[in-house]
Swiss-Prot record:
Renumbered residue ranges of the record's region Disordered: 1-22, 111-188
All copies of domain KRAB-related, residue ranges: 20-83
Organism name: Homo sapiens
Protein name: Protein SSX1
Associated pathology: Spermatogenic failure, X-linked, 5: A male infertility disorder characterized by reduced progressive sperm motility and multiple morphologic sperm abnormalities, resulting in asthenoteratozoospermia.
Compartments reported by the entry: Cytoplasm, Cytoskeleton, Flagellum axoneme
UniProt xrefs under InterPro entries: aKRAB (IPR003655), KRAB (IPR001909), KRAB_dom_sf (IPR036051), SSXRD_motif (IPR019041)
Stated family: Belongs to the SSX family.
Expressed in which tissues: Expressed at high level in the testis. Expressed at low level in thyroid. Not detected in tonsil, colon, lung, spleen, prostate, kidney, striated and smooth muscles. Detected in rhabdomyosarcoma and fibrosarcoma cell lines. Not detected in mesenchymal and epithelial cell lines. Expressed in testis.
């Protein structure tokens, strides 16, 4: 291995990196006046570059992200009269419609069907557990509603503090853990 070869490649890499950096800085400089840009330190400029890069990445993934504050001023001027067809962020928002909670709630089916409380107490399929541990025993008394029924009643139309509690479910079979001994320990 010749050490001179590794150092010979380094200036080209630095030139590419500085070219990318200057291109990114020029892109960010459009959001600020020349006076503001000259006052800024290098660390502030690079943080704005990363902020814009993160914003673009998140919008490409389809997330609804608030526009960074320094970019809001530029878009306000674009609304006043500039052509919007060249704005990359605008195209991304059009291509990826934002998913709201209401749409998501309609798309995802509910796990537990809603039934009146009388029907749930009469049906034994919900209150009984089949399996070797329980042998068909009831998990809760027939007169009382189980925990999942209470949660389902509370989370119906209210949808306030506990919006996702309707997804909780009660275990049908008890989980019993046993200690497994090693065969080597048994030999001793």
């Amino acid at each position: 291995m010749n050490g001179d070869d590794t150092f010979a490649k380094r200036p080209r890499d630095d030139a590419k990196a500085s070219e990318k950096r200057s291109k990114a800085f020029d892109d960010i400089a459009t959001y600020f006046s020349k006076k503001e840009w000259k006052k800024m330190k290098y660390s502030e400029k690079i943080s704005y570059v990363y902020m814009k890069r993160n914003y673009k990445a998140m919008t490409k993934l389809g997330f609804k992200v608030t526009l960074p504050p320094f970019m809001c001023n530029k878009q306000a001027t674009d609304f006043q009269g500039n052509d919007f067809d060249n704005d990359h962020n605008r195209r991304i928002q059009v291509e990826h419609p934002q998913m709201t909670f209401g749409r998501l709630h309609r798309i995802i089916p509910k796990i537990m069907p809603k039934k009146p409380a009388e029907d749930e107490n009469d049906s034994k399929g919900v209150s009984e557990a089949s399996g070797p541990q329980n042998d068909g025993k009831q998990l809760h008394p027939p007169g009382k509603a189980n925990i999942s029924e209470k949660i389902n009643k509370r989370s119906g139309p209210k949808r306030g503090k506990h919006a996702w509690t309707h997804r909780l479910r009660e275990r049908k079979q008890l989980v019993i853990y046993e200690e497994i001994s090693d065969p080597e320990e048994d030999d001793e």
